[in-house]
Amino acid sequence: MNEVVAKKYVKAILSDVKSNELNAFVENLSELAAAFASDKFKSIISLPTLKASQKVEFVLSLVKNQDAKFANFIKLLGANKRLELIPAILDEMKIEQSLLENTYRGEVVGNFDLSAEQLKALEENFSKKFNSKIKLDGSKSDYNGVKVELDDLGVEVNFSIDRLKSQMSEYILKAI
């Protein structure tokens, strides 16, 4: 339910904010969304004894570089008692921003560390394939192989060493 409401707010923001203001808007939302990681912050936002205007003042005090549009947006969220939607709005905003800029983020997961050159080569190849700018982050996990996930594009490419071993043994058994 929150995602649907967040999408409506994002649509309204995008119709009013110019492209050069969009990055600042996303940065401000990122600062606020980071505050939602704190349980104290969440409890302050959800306190029924605080007035909406006090909550809005508190939230706006956390943002360093705010403009009038951003302040009005936060005031609107506060008046509608939807300040807790800020992280969901940020997620939707990042998705829309990546669509507008044709830039997507992904993750490379494997049981070994990839060098910066390897990541860059993967980024270039995927960028050519999808005619977009792809930025990949590498992470190490228990996965026995390599997996590239581009969630925004709905793409997952994986190579499993275990699967390769089983397919090779099947092929050898069939050949015999």
From Swiss-Prot:
Q: Name one GO molecular function term.
A: proton-transporting ATP synthase activity, rotational mechanism
Q: How does it sit in the membrane?
A: Peripheral membrane protein
Q: What is this protein called?
A: ATP synthase subunit delta
GO cellular-component terms in the record? plasma membrane; proton-transporting ATP synthase complex
Q: Which organism is it from?
A: Campylobacter concisus (strain 13826)
Q: Where in the cell is it found?
A: Cell inner membrane
Predominant location: membrane
Q: Which InterPro entries match?
A: ATP_synth_OSCP/delta_N_sf (IPR026015), ATPase_OSCP/dsu (IPR000711)
Q: Which UniProt keywords apply?
A: ATP synthesis, Cell inner membrane, Cell membrane, CF(1), Hydrogen ion transport, Ion transport, Membrane, Transport
Q: Which family does it belong to?
A: Belongs to the ATPase delta chain family.
Task: Please give the subunit comment from the record.
Answer: F-type ATPases have 2 components, F(1) - the catalytic core - and F(0) - the membrane proton channel. F(1) has five subunits: alpha(3), beta(3), gamma(1), delta(1), epsilon(1). F(0) has three main subunits: a(1), b(2) and c(10-14). The alpha and beta chains form an alternating ring which encloses part of the gamma chain. F(1) is attached to F(0) by a central stalk formed by the gamma and epsilon chains, while a peripheral stalk is formed by the delta and b chains.
Q: In which domain of life is the source organism classified?
A: Bacteria
Which SUPFAM superfamilies is this protein grouped with? N-terminal domain of the delta subunit of the F1F0-ATP synthase
The membrane-spanning stretches of this chain are: none
What's its job? Answer: F(1)F(0) ATP synthase produces ATP from ADP in the presence of a proton or sodium gradient. F-type ATPases consist of two structural domains, F(1) containing the extramembraneous catalytic core and F(0) containing the membrane proton channel, linked together by a central stalk and a peripheral stalk. During catalysis, ATP synthesis in the catalytic domain of F(1) is coupled via a rotary mechanism of the central stalk subunits to proton translocation.
